[in-house]
Curated annotation (Swiss-Prot):
This is Large ribosomal subunit protein bL21. Belongs to the bacterial ribosomal protein bL21 family. Residues 78-91 have a biased composition (Basic residues). Part of the 50S ribosomal subunit. Contacts protein L20. It comes from Methylobacterium radiotolerans (strain ATCC 27329 / DSM 1819 / JCM 2831 / NBRC 15690 / NCIMB 10815 / 0-1). The gene is rplU. SUPFAM superfamilies: L21p-like.
């Protein structure tokens, strides 16, 4: 059994006991989180439900494992022969979530 959920503008294929890294969510480690935007649901018997765009009555629950930050991305601009350059770093926040179940 698996589902495709949408969170943070991206889509993720999840099943029970999966661990996913998504955009930053509010909440502390250990808190429960519910994803209501389910785009696709497939049970183990071969039946698949596809939403248009989402499915109602199906939700995915998870637990926040930890919060963290991605590797640094460097934005570097240089204007040749002008002795002009700019270097800026950015680290995006993320949240690691363990999927606890899919309720249909």
């Amino acid at each position: 059994m698996f589902a495709v959920i949408k969170t943070g503008g991206k889509q993720y294929r999840v099943a029970a006991n999966d661990t996913i890294t998504i955009a930053s969510l509010a909440g502390e480690a250990g808190e429960a989180v519910t994803f209501g935007e389910v785009l696709l649901f497939a049970d183990g018997a071969g039946a698949t439900q596809v939403g248009a765009p989402t499915l109602s009555g199906i939700s995915v629950t998870g637990e926040i494992v930890r919060h963290g930050r991605d590797k640094k991305v460097i934005a570097f601009k240089k204007r040749r022969r002008q002795n002009s350059r700019r270097k800026r770093g950015h680290r995006q926040d993320h949240t690691v979530v363990r999927i606890t179940g899919i309720s249909a």
